[in-house]
UniProtKB/Swiss-Prot annotation:
Belongs to the LarC family. Keywords: Nickel. The keyword Hydrolase does not apply. It comes from the Archaea. It holds the Pfam family Ni_insertion. One of its GO terms (molecular function) is lyase activity. This is Putative nickel insertion protein.
Length: 396
């Protein structure tokens, strides 16, 4: 699988991401042409050295560096740029991530918000250029290893703020990206955080595979370690996706079966991906249960709170963060004939990234309704629906 990997060991900003993609092989002539046709800027690209490492440096030269724009104005600029449909969609989505974060931090609606640093022409150029470069690279997967956010404080249009600045923190809170802090200055900007959040899946390490090419995008900071963003194009093994999960666990010994039964539904509504409850013998020979919950990191705290509230447990363990291999899933409808009637059943189709179908399962509620209506055994309705789905796929 053709995979793009970002390694932000020294942070990431919009220009570092753009530079890293160009250094990796994205056509700089095309990118400059697209940027300058979209935004009133000029672009220079050169090779520089950061702590002994050669890297590509991208400089966006603006004519109106103090311009403050609303979210609507930013979107209008992107829509008027005649970009490829995918690039336009992605660029708007990146700015929406930034806008939603800024609006929440400042306690206002997106429509009321006015962008300062991230609304200027250089930020527009970075986002449009990066979205176009990724569009042209035709990768099947994008990964990001843990991000160094930096430390200390930074001077902004809103005054001196701690690093990471509140908008960056808000973007990261729902991203699933792993972060750490090393340094005494801002290394991860809101634009960099939004681009990585939108495009990349988190990974705690490099994937297994062959490194095809490596690039380095230069940042502006002068630090002890090279202030560069490393990019890699890899041929990774396997066609299954990876998902970033956490496992929550707690022991209870004084909770009734009725409460535990209700707990399943409650936790799933709070965002749990799976819940299992295992009988166990606790201290002093008491009968109890171990509750295991699989969840995305952004939902873990809410689920842990609900576990405490529902069961009275005083602590919930979070096991080390895990990755799981997952199949891609899509829902389709098939028609089955029983007697003289035609019934529609939803089926879930699991497939890998190359679209090879791995498994098909009929939706239980549809099959149960049909079984009750026509008197055919449930397992026979399920068999017919899944068989019809397989036949449809084999005909394609």
């Amino acid at each position: 699988m053709r995979t793009l990997v970002f390694e932000p060991f020294s942070g990431a900003s919009g220009d570092m991401i753009l530079a890293g993609l160009i250094d990796l092989g994205a056509d700089k002539g095309e990118i400059v042409e697209v940027i300058q046709a979209s935004v009133d800027v000029s672009v220079t690209i050169e090779d520089i050295t950061k702590c002994g490492i050669r890297a590509t440096d991208v400089n966006i030269h603006t004519k109106d560096s103090a311009r403050i724009r609303s979210f609507g104005e930013l979107i209008d600029i992107i829509k008027d740029a005649n970009l490829p449909e995918e690039v336009e969609k992605n660029a708007i989505a990146v700015f929406r991530i930034i806008g939603d974060a800024e609006a929440k931090v400042h306690g206002m609606s997106l429509e009321q918000l006015h962008f300062h640093e991230v609304g200027q022409d250089d930020a527009l150029a970075d986002v449009i250029g990066s979205c176009y470069a990724i569009h042209r690279m035709k990768v099947e997967n994008i990964l990001c290893t843990p991000v160094n956010v930096g430390g200390g404080s930074v001077r902004t249009a809103h005054g001196t703020l701690p690093v990471p600045v509140p908008a960056t923190t808000e973007i990261l809170s729902g991203s699933g990206l792993e972060v750490h802090s090393n340094g005494d200055r801002e290394l991860l900007t809101p634009t960099g955080a939004a681009l990585l959040t939108y495009f990349a899946n988190p990974s705690d390490q490099l994937p297994t595979g062959k490194i095809l090419t490596t690039g380095y995008g230069a940042g502006d900071a002068e630090t002890d370690m090279p202030n560069v963003l490393r990019t890699m194009l890899m041929e990774t093994t396997g066609n299954l996706s990876r998902d970033h999960m956490e496992v929550l666990e707690t022991n209870v010994d004084d909770v009734t079966g009725e409460v535990l039964g209700n707990l399943f539904e409650t936790l799933m509504k709070e965002g749990a991906k799976d819940v299992t409850i295992t009988p166990a013998t606790m201290k002093k020979g008491r009968t109890g249960h171990i509750i295991h919950v699989i969840a995305h990191p952004e939902n873990s705290e809410r689920i842990a709170r609900e576990l405490i509230r529902q069961t009275g447990t005083l602590g919930v363990r979070i096991l080390p963060t895990k990755h799981r291999f997952i199949a891609e899933r899509k829902m389709e409808k098939v028609n089955i004939i029983i007697g003289k009637q035609t019934f529609q059943v939803t089926v879930k189709i699991a497939h890998d990234r190359s679209d090879e179908v791995l498994h098909i399962s009929a939706e239980f509620e549809d099959c149960r309704r049909i079984s009750q209506e026509c008197g055919l055994p449930l397992k026979e309705v399920i068999r017919r629906a899944e068989e019809k789905a397989w036949n449809n796929i084999l005909k394609k």
